[in-house]
Amino acid sequence: MRVNGSAKLVCKTRVKEVSPDGEPILVEPMGNFTVIKDLVTDMDSFWSKMKSIDPYVKTDFEPEAEHIASNESMTHLLGVMNCIMCGACVSECTAMEVDPTFTGPAALAKAYRFVADPRDEETNSRLGDLNKSTGVWDCTRCLACVEVCPKDVAPMER
């Protein structure tokens, strides 16, 4: 939801933080989502975009056991792996206000998670898809997504 004009996790937001002197608090539905009713928004477009980046490790072989990557090769992914899919970044994305077909910061962060995974063998294909219209180049780099992310994923700093 949006609290006083900014996306927040209302389950973790304390009234004292947003209204230290007791001023009125404005609670609104998330931006860039269709409102179903009151504060409820339709997240279908969010999940469709997430699905469109094919969020799975792809290999050309069938591993005989679990395909484990070393800790060293995965530490740079910890930030994007912390994403809780709350949609706060999408709610604040100025590029999505202009073009709702833009892939968006959450899906781009998730895409980075697989592009940078050493076990994934579809990196070139993924990068080709992200290089198309509505992909990474539609981002305006305003960093609004970075400011509101409750888990410090920093989608556009990847």
Region locations from a protein language model:
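Ferredoxin-type iron-sulfur electron-transfer modules in oxidoreductases and energy-metabolism complexes
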Residues: 26-33, 37-158
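Hydrophobic/aromatic-rich structural module bridging two neighboring secondary-structure elements via a short loop
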Residues: 1-31
